[in-house]
């Protein structure tokens, strides 16, 4: 079965104070849980600041990856270095999946792991078995990565809620955040929110197209 795997670690994790460590872990788990109505998804931490996520429906892997980064940035405490993660998405077959993610194996794990080994200063990369797909998605992923890395906490929260509750009006989401609609709209536009959502939808449709080939 083709699934998605996200391999990641926290950026500058040694700068995160001990009192915030559990909060960061909770943020990651809470974010992943938000997607359970769409797909089975499981997150497992290892080596303290590293983690892997398995996504049963691979078309949602990018949405989950962006949501993880958005949620981390949105929940960063005041006067702290912005929380973020480096994430490598791998899409492929997973013939063997054990109870523990880190002992599972398959194409998606290998693609994700190898990509993560070469992620360098990037914070989002995607690898699949399809060369044409990788070429089509690489440039727009670099652009999206640059946009996400520049988000403020408020911009990140606005995009995060818009991704999760696409059926809600901006006015309703603004009220949830105790913002005016104008303020919400300002953060949405400055975060390039619509472009990010379009990128996510493009990824979803492209993945499904290649899977069906």
Regions flagged by a language model, labelled:
Residues 1-213:
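Regulatory and interdomain segments flanking nucleotide-handling catalytic cores
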């Amino acid at each position: 079965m083709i699934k998605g795997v996200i391999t990641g670690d926290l950026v500058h994790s040694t700068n995160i104070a001990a009192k915030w460590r559990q909060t960061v872990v909770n943020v990651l788990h809470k974010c992943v849980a938000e997607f359970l109505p769409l797909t089975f998804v499981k997150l497992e931490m290892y080596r303290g600041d590293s983690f892997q996520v398995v996504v049963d429906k691979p078309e949602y892997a990018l949405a989950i990856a962006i949501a993880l980064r958005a949620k981390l940035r949105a929940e960063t405490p005041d006067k702290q270095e912005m929380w973020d993660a480096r994430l490598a998405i791998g899409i492929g077959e997973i013939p063997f999946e054990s109870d523990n993610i880190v002992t599972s194996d398959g194409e998606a794990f290998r693609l994700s792991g190898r990509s993560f080994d070469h992620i360098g200063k990037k914070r989002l990369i995607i690898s699949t078995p399809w060369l044409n797909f990788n070429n089509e998605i690489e440039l727009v992923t670099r652009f999206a990565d640059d946009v996400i890395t520049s988000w403020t906490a408020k911009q990140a929260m606005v995009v995060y809620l818009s991704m999760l509750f696409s059926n809600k009006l901006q006015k309703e989401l603004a009220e949830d955040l105790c913002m005016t609609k104008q303020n919400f709209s300002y953060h949405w536009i400055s975060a390039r929110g619509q472009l990010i959502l379009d990128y996510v939808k493009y990824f979803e449709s492209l993945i499904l197209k290649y899977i069906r080939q």
